[in-house]
């Protein structure tokens, strides 16, 4: 029987500080729990939403129960006995970091057990010899930034100077990343991409996981805004991914929606679809669920939870986006085929109530739905790789090097 897998990854949707959170300075972080608490206490009310966090479809798949198992606390406003239709687990990250690439790679069978390179200095973050080499190879006359920053704030602070000089803005964060900001029209999108490609080649030996192009538009700080033409340049995964096994062993289709292809350096991806907003990501995902052939894996990263609300520490915005996603999840469930396996998960936390603006080291929810899957708690996963191993089992692929299968279908012992 031909099968399909649909993975919906809510970027940054952690469910509580993991057992090693202290090592990352993240004790007390709980993305879901703290959003739910704020909503329950009417501290996340806005023109768009109010009251307790309402996620009935995620709850039916086991979200609240997964959080309860992870933290011993049910998120405020959630049901202790929901109408459960899914099987659920929670997962601890094995990888040595709390970034997007580490989380995504691990769940597809390539945990990051080495240390990425980082730029730890808050100011003058990048080594002079690196900056000099970038200038020499790209012929840019100068640069701005060279610091740790919030991506939206640095555009406000330096965007006008960038328009005067056309010097690109360089910045980083606690992640293994080198980000380049430039005006999409005045500097040029192709010029920005070319600059990022050169920078990536220079930085790859330092094990910098990603160089990210961050284009923006607008005439002054009041109307500057990022565009949908972000592009990530990532190091290639160091181990064979589930995607590659699926293509080699079953001639499967691997469909990337959003930034998935960039995260995996386009390894094992057969089709790519971009989308600019949360609504567009939902629309494209539903279109593929309706139209993709059997023997396909559809994988969407819903980046806006992280980029628009987690990093910006916007509790109300995060809650509103979750409620919008939950309403669209109803459509997903209605359009699944007879033998589709649906998985909802995350890659790390980014608690909008927590100090700073960085990711948070948290457990992630792992929620499964299939018509023949018994609703039940599947336990704690010691690695996100259990997700990939479970998919390999479902699709009849050879096992991955990491992870264990979590799935037990009706009729199986």
UniProtKB/Swiss-Prot annotation:
SUPFAM superfamilies for this protein: Alkaline phosphatase-like, DeoB insert domain-like
Cofactor(s) the record lists: Mn(2+)
Lyase as UniProt keyword: no
Keywords from the named record: Cytoplasm, Isomerase, Manganese, Metal-binding
Binding site for Mn(2+) 1: 11, 347-348
Chain's gene name: deoB
Pathway listed: Carbohydrate degradation; 2-deoxy-D-ribose 1-phosphate degradation; D-glyceraldehyde 3-phosphate and acetaldehyde from 2-deoxy-alpha-D-ribose 1-phosphate: step 1/2
EC class of the enzyme, as a word: isomerase
Family to which this protein belongs: Belongs to the phosphopentomutase family.
Full protein name: Phosphopentomutase
Broad class of the protein's primary localization: cytoplasm
InterPro entries for this protein: Alkaline_phosphatase_core_sf, DeoB, Metalloenzyme, Phosphopentomutase_DeoB_cap_sf
NCBIfam families: deoB, PRK05362.1
Organism: Helicobacter pylori (strain Shi470)
Residues that bind Mn(2+) 2: 306, 311, 359
Keyword NADP assigned: no
Cell compartment(s), UniProt: Cytoplasm
GO biological process terms on file: 2-deoxyribose 1-phosphate catabolic process; 5-phosphoribose 1-diphosphate biosynthetic process; metabolic compound salvage; nucleotide metabolic process
Described purpose of this protein according to its UniProt entry: Isomerase that catalyzes the conversion of deoxy-ribose 1-phosphate (dRib-1-P) and ribose 1-phosphate (Rib-1-P) to deoxy-ribose 5-phosphate (dRib-5-P) and ribose 5-phosphate (Rib-5-P), respectively.
Known catalytic reactions: 2-deoxy-alpha-D-ribose 1-phosphate = 2-deoxy-D-ribose 5-phosphate; alpha-D-ribose 1-phosphate = D-ribose 5-phosphate
Note on how the cofactor is bound: Binds 2 manganese ions.
């Amino acid at each position: 029987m031909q099968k399909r897998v649909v993975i919906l990854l809510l970027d940054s949707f952690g469910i509580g500080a993991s057992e090693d959170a202290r090592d990352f300075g993240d004790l007390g972080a709980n993305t879901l729990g703290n959003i739910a608490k704020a909503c329950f206490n009417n501290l996340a009310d806005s023109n768009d939403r109010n009251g307790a966090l309402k996620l009935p479809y995620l709850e039916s798949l086991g979200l609240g129960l997964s959080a309860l198992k992870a933290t011993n606390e049910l998120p405020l406003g959630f049901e202790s006995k929901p109408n459960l239709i899914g099987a659920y687990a929670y997962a601890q990250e094995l990888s040595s970091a709390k970034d997007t690439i580490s989380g995504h790679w691990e769940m597809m069978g390539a945990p990051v057990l080495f240390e990425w390179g980082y730029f730890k200095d808050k100011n003058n973050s990048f080594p002079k010899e690196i900056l000099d080499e970038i200038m020499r190879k790209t012929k840019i006359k100068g640069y701005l930034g060279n610091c740790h920053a919030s991506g939206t704030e640095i555009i406000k602070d330096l965007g006008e100077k960038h328009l005067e000089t056309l010097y690109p803005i360089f910045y980083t964060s606690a992640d293994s990343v080198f980000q380049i900001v430039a005006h999409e029209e005045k500097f040029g999108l192709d010029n920005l991409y070319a600059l990022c490609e050169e920078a990536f080649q220079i930085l790859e030996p330092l094990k910098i996981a990603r160089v990210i192009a961050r284009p923006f538009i607008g005439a002054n700080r009041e109307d500057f805004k990022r565009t949908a033409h972000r592009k990530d340049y990532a190091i290639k995964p160091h181990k064979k991914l589930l995607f590659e096994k699926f293509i080699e062993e079953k001639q499967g289709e691997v469909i990337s929606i959003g930034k998935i292809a960039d995260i995996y350096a386009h390894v094992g991806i057969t089709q790519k679809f971009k989308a600019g907003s949360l609504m567009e990501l939902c629309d494209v995902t539903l279109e593929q669920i309706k139209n993709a052939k059997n023997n396909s894996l559809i994988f969407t990263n819903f980046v806006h939870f992280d980029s628009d609300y987690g990093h910006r520490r916007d509790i109300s915005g995060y809650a509103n986006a979750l409620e919008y996603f939950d309403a669209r999840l109803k459509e997903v469930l209605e359009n699944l085929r007879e033998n589709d396996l649906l998985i909802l998960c995350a890659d790390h936390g980014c608690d909008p109530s927590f100090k700073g603006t960085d990711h948070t080291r948290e457990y992630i929810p792992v929620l499964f739905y299939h018509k023949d899957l018994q609703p039940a708690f599947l336990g704690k996963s010691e690695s996100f790789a259990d997700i990939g191993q479970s998919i390999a089992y479902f699709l009849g692929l050879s096992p991955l090097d990491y992870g264990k299968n979590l799935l037990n279908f009706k009729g199986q012992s």
